[in-house]
């Protein structure tokens, strides 16, 4: 115990610079006497190894923001304009009326989605009163606003999937109700993010629209509902579709093009500031809205290229080694949302503008499989949860897009023999994308096969395992990383997937 406490104090006293050759550490972990039964000796040996790591003669300075500008190098605005696929011809899903195609795509998901929709036929769309928004500035409680907000959004997404699955019009009235109610809201922004308005208050100000994680996702969902059901809506009353277009334009399209000060776009980024998962997350949602709603080629090209310049800021900020400094819990929103954005961009340009073959993007994807210890445990640096593993359907389609067998096998491994079913929740894009890969994932070989050593020199993460069931994760870094809470020089030790020492 004293040895462990000493190691902890050493690791925290200075920014740890990991030894340049982690393979030395791997070899050290494999020394013959590790097969002895004396667990204490093994642990002491391991601690000595990490002291060597901490005081290694060769240090590695973490790279700062790097002007890669990968997307802008892939195409300028003129090239982009020439390759844009217009009038939603890029959408990879059948038309709502093509029932045979939907039956084929839905497969075993069909009855499950219809049953979920049937539970919402009598759903009462929830009003969010002014006091629910104000509660955030009064007490800091954001849930009182977010719970009914998210219930409405999930209901709208589920009803969309149910109607696409069945195609008989049973869910159209409820979809109409949900879309109409959504348009009647003053804002789709979460109360906790509304203080970014000029008023600095948590009550929506109808005179100003900003884009956050909530409004972007809500706008994308509304854009998909409009795309699939505009014609049946118009048969009932065309005012609803008109109102949807107006709401999406005013809340997403216009502020996206006219406001350079939204921090997550990073157009005014300064050294020392953080660019985190908000960037690809919000940009992926905005890109869906533009590709689904904007049919003027000049305006669309300007919007898409603006998104490319913004996402380049995120790619420039993250480390090229592929690690997610925000931790495994945020991987789906950081690297995962970057993948979503790149997939949408590739689809919207007929595959002409794509970074999915870039090694850096693949490394960002494989970070999740490398960070999985086993039996539900993951390396939880920063404020990530210690248990998880990620969304198998997201991991699979990411892996397939970047040609990573490791990720595809890992996705099947996470299912643990269960059948893959379409994702529901509130994310329309991921729900729809999950339909495209369920059948292939069901046939994939389940395997979690990672190297003995994974070394992230820029982010300063190192993972090591050996044949005796030991898995060690160590972190250098510094405490101005996104979602980091003084995780400077920390480590975790797992034996047979069970956490033994967690330096929390």
Q: Would you name each region that the model predicts?
A:
Residues 1-2, 11-14, 18-66:
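Bacterial Sec-dependent N-terminal signal peptides
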Residues 65-137:
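Low-complexity, Ser/Thr/Pro/Gly-enriched N-terminal "stalk/linker" regions
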Residues 90, 140-152, 164, 199-215, ...:
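Solvent-exposed loop and edge beta-strand segments that line ligand/cofactor-binding
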Residues 117-128, 175-193, 240-266, 302-322, ...:
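Long, well-ordered core segments of solenoidal/helical folds
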Residues 151-161, 210-227, 275-291, 331-343, ...:
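Well-ordered alpha-helical segments within folded domains of soluble proteins
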Residues 201-327, 340, 439-444:
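Active-site lining segments of carbohydrate-active enzymes
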Residues 335-502:
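Carbohydrate-active enzyme catalytic cores, enriched for enzymes
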